[in-house]
């Protein structure tokens, strides 16, 4: 259950497998994740930062207590979204930092994942000067920067946002692909899924024509 505003909430049922958990991220979320495997207290040498379309800010705090010494370091992320006259989305991100640079590991790398941009163009400036972006092939626009304390990084990703139906269709393909077995019903549903043109066709197909298991239909319909 999550709340919208201060008064009325909305209940959502999110169906997932036992091996995964449902996670909701609001527009503009900036989510830093450590690449370290297992639990630990040292500040990470490599970070993955997930950026979701929208406007948002996040300041990450790190200290040197794991090394039993003083020192603080702050990394600030500011995300902004604009739309061009042609309907393209420009998701920008500015990264600044301050404090004791000795707190973080030397040679830190930050992997930036623009979650809602499945493909697009990247513009990178370091210290106000254009720089080449190290683009990584992944399921969304991803680049890696060699982070230096005190430097300013400006990234702009221009992309055309997927329609709600196209995004749902890709998710439906993953759900059907992950179903147990290869029975004829699943195979037929996967094939006919490719022929759907809009949400109305999809709703009619899965509610009235499909012989898919009820739990699968519920998962397919939950994002409508």
Predicted regions span which residues?
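Short, surface-exposed loop motifs enriched in S/T, G, D/E and P with embedded aromatic residues
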Residues: 84, 131-136
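Sequence-level detector for tyrosine residue identity
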Residues: 2, 58-61, 137, 153, ...
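Extended Gly/Ser/Thr-rich low-complexity repeat segments
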Residues: 103-120, 149-169
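Intrinsic disorder/low-structure terminal segments
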Residues: 51, 60, 72-76, 136, ...
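Catalytic core of carbohydrate-active enzymes
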Residues: 1-128
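A surface-exposed beta-strand-loop module
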Residues: 135-154
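Mature N-terminal, pre-catalytic/accessory segment of carbohydrate-active enzymes
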Residues: 150, 157-224
């Amino acid at each position: 259950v999550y709340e919208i505003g201060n008064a009325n909430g909305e209940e959502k049922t999110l169906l997932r497998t036992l091996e995964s958990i449902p996670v909701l991220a609001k527009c503009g979320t900036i989510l830093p994740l450590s690449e370290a495997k297992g639990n630990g207290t040292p500040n990470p040498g490599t970070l993955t930062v997930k950026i979701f379309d929208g406007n948002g800010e996040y300041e990450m705090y790190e200290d040197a207590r794991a090394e039993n010494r003083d020192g603080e370091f702050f990394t600030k992320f500011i995300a902004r979204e604009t739309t061009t006259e042609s309907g393209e989305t420009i998701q920008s991100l500015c990264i600044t930092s301050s404090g004791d640079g000795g707190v973080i590991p030397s040679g830190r790398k930050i992997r930036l994942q623009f979650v809602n941009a499945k493909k697009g163009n990247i513009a990178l400036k370091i210290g106000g000067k254009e720089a080449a972006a190290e683009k990584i092939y992944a399921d969304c626009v991803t680049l890696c920067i060699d982070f230096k304390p005190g430097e300013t990084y400006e990234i702009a990703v221009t992309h055309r946002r997927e329609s709600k139906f196209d995004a749902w269709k890709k998710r439906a393909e993953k759900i059907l692909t992950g179903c147990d077995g290869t029975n004829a019903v699943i195979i037929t549903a996967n094939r006919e899924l490719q022929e759907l043109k809009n949400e109305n066709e999809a709703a009619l197909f899965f509610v009235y024509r499909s012989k898919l298991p009820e739990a699968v239909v519920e998962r397919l319909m939950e994002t409508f």
